[in-house]
Amino acid sequence: MELESQVFEALEAVGIKRGQTVLDFGCGSGMYTIPAAEIVGEQGKLYALDKDKKVLDELMRKAKSVGLKNIERMETSGEPKIDLTDESVDGVLLFDVFHSYYFPQVDDRRRVLNEIYRIMKPSAFISVWPKHMESQAKDEIENADFYLESEYTGTLIHDNYDREKGQILNFRKR
């Protein structure tokens, strides 16, 4: 299976659909952002949040080169504050960023989850690839008033386009 189709398969499996508004938290250079923006289409919106200006610049160049106009970049200082209104997104991607490297303290991760909870519509999902802390992440997310709805296991793409078997956990608000 080619790289791009594996990414699309994973995103569709976690619930991304045409017309949705999705936040890719810690989007990096856009491995999942670009395909997610293609799935949500022109009626949808993809917020790409990262603290690295260079990777956001790269992401926006890629988006422009493929004609995508539905991606909005969001630079952050790394604080767990998301500059979106309450109940404004249908889904949040939290792929390989919810771990102690980026958020060393449990309280930091809890503040991130509280912000995500705030911006999620009542029916929204949060999709987490807890690459570096699988069991701990599940417990922390459930303790933040989310419940595990489903799991997706398949080939996922990591830094430098490395393919690896992984598991994505999908949660919803309680």
Language-model segments: residues:
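Class I SAM-dependent methyltransferase SAM/SAH-binding core
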Residues: 23, 29-80
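Conserved alpha-helix/loop element of class I SAM-dependent methyltransferases that forms part
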Residues: 2-20
